[in-house]
């Protein structure tokens, strides 16, 4: 880049005399051009590439390992979707059959007990609320204290003392079921008389009665037919506040009693009729009662206020019938559907025209119902006014329910009889759950004795996601109640979740309506605590012609179909599975089968042409290698030590078998490992005789363990000989079946799955290339690390076309990468980093090395920092380069967002430089590092300049969700996913987006016994205190060069080297993110003192130059126009201000009045942006994005504009807490409600099970902006 000669400084000084300014400008330009001619970014990229290859070959052992895998003998396997889908469907059917057998067995016992009850009454009660704690103990399967020997009961208010209760007869049967069936959770019997019996017994926090008969599971089991329901709330002038509150509470109870198989609408009526405005489709159609629709309807009901106008009853019924009719016309009508209108009203008509109003209402009902063959039932609930009963009003409401139109002189239009409903009185003492919540008892009981399968929901009592299998119990025609079994979803879906046949195939499971239960885009059920959005499979498989495939899947019990898909309209994770990327189209093969005796359909998808899967033939273990399982805590390893926070050993690598290595992944995850089990694994895996029985591992796992053992000698040698050991955290190799070999050998969390980590996925997506990932916070305690990973292939002839049999990875400290940059590219350090900056970014635009990532006064978390965030000038320019970067969209259904992200072209030839004319303040060069997924860039900033990249400070919301331009600079961000609640379909624009790849899963640190921790020494002692020079300390394991005092601003007179925990990030006493997930010292305020005016000297000089030389006038004019174009991009342009980005998650910022040295490093991050004060918002809004578990962190969003904040105003209403909650056996549990984020509704970004507490502080930003608030009707 532009190396400035020493004479330049004096030339610049003389240039202040206007007559010489132009000469200086020309001279500088010529000198700069000459310097750039001497410098080649392509040569520097080659230097970096050589270093990367050396690291991969020497430190990681990629070349050696590939040579070893080339020598193995393989058997070839071609995927056959048709045969495999039948085998997999059979396994899933067997699981369901086990639970159906449990349900049928429990049903038989209940029905037999009732026969006995008739002669010898069974009425004994074991109240769940009074069980002594001594009878229970903690059970990991239920994640709470239970008794595995007895059941207990919860009672409704209406239960009489003689009610049938088979609970004690059931105990032995329920206990046997629990012992013999893995994955089983709660079992229960819910009686029609109001007794809820649950096993195992658990002590509830009881504040009142418990009405299980108004819960969705009970309702959908005793009335399995679909229900179309319209609820009308009367809020006219004659309805008092007390009556209106009763009506609102009753409507909430109805909402909580129905599920996704039903359709619902809520209307309010006074002089006009209103529908919920939170989705436009509610005005026209009924909507499936998903949790999202129920939440919106609940919000609408809560907002209803009394009206001053009289009630027009007829208008309400007219709209209700219209909704039902339009829904029937729009969808495939099912013959057994029950249609019901529920009217919550005082029944008062106007005094002047009472009879006319009544007649008009009955006439509307008569006419409209005749269009629907008199199939709609009307239920009316009379709202009492302080105990005073109006007989005329009650009679009117009864006539409405019974549709007595003849009484008012309205002739019947049809010969078909009407379905008479009922009228019930409600007052303040009414138990709404027992009355309104049981509205379904008016509907016909068709005595359908079939198992009902619920969709997945959260187990509020225990942990994880569950689904319920339930059946009704009858004695003759008498309904006794229902029996149900809650099944762990992770167990049911384990064969789908861990399906691993080849990289080119995957599987999904849907129900017979098309709802998706499991798909590769979704996180493993074991780690979820909230269900993903119930979404149709067509949105996951969003490729041309899939709609036809979907129709066939839902209509044919068995079949297969192949469709051709153009590459340019494909899914990103399909592209990753292709190996012949030159073709314009590829084939996708779908093979499916209905899982017998259930409502589920399994499908296997194969991307063609696929690479044949090569499986290792029987191998023997390396004689010199020792097989050591990772459970060092169970094995009592004498050579154990601490590798930062992890229990570890330097004696040899350890083997970790993740859940995917086991035939039953769920069983492995849910049961504790014992020493005996570990010994069995070790004996089997190291057995060359093949005589020891398999302890439940997949067939190919032993060969993978033995194959990876060949790397042991290489790593052990490097540990002794390598000069880079002080920078290397760990080395590891992982196989597709989840075998992980790691050195130093370390204790890992059993839920860890290497095949779902970013370093593994990046390597698989870039076969044969060196992939860079990070930086991210190492869960083992090593601070921020960067990973180099590389694939190992079965084929030796052409790396990129071989089947991937393993991925190798090595973790370096973050600062080591910047050290490499400084050492190999001297130009980066020639002016102390003040004007010339170097960086490395990977193919999604995230920075791996950059001055601000290692600067102690940058203060930002260094994860997920994007080039748009740190180098907005460069980002703005490279977006204009054709075919280099593409801004992509994808739909994320697990958190209901549209994600925006970048993908850079890794086949870039040559280098990139400034494209936009006039960008003289900032020159850059960018080139791909050959053989990697990364790019190296150099920026030479000769004067202050402004650029705009839209980045939110508080969350990940995009500035403008209504449009996305390829050449507009913005940080990776997200928008709410707009779904038509009535059809479940996406809006047309978002329907074109592919579904996102799976989210990165959090990694959990496995805690070890504190006593053991104190007794162990550190495996690696970096002797930080003995490192006296910055160069000896920089990037070394567990060491930090302490440069800044504890106030976060003052430079130390004598910097020194210390352990990381003493001055994390180079700041004395800074809190480690391992303590509280915050790297902050304290809250700080950005004031207007920090806002600098833009320089105007060059502009004045340009004008003078115009006067002197006509030829250069054009140049100066263009320069001036360019400067203004930058300034006009911001609301702050009038003040010529810029606010430097600040990362709020860390609650601190450096001042711009720091030393000249600091300004040089940081000044490149200046944006034009509007930053507003958001301390009034609840920290819940931030937690939706920042309160992540483990290492998952998405901290790269630093500038927010007020338009974004007002575009998505927050709703402060609490979501509807009553959903499908079989596991929630106490409505009074102290459960956390989901945080509210305006546009994202009640969905969290990740619903992970293990959550770490995160501190949240209020943030105060002050800048000269005007914010317009927007009121939202919630």
Curated annotation (Swiss-Prot):
It is found in: Membrane. Residues 453-532, 772-853 form the Cache domain. Residues 36-1095 are extracellular. InterPro entries: Ca_channel_alpha-2/delta, Sensor-like_sf, VWF_A, vWFA_dom_sf. Gene3D superfamilies: PAS domain, von Willebrand factor, type A domain. Its main location: membrane. Residues 1-35 form the signal peptide. Glycans are attached at residue 145. GO terms for molecular function: voltage-gated calcium channel activity. The keyword Glycosyltransferase does not apply. Coiled coil: none annotated. May regulate voltage-dependent calcium channels. This is VWFA and cache domain-containing protein 1.
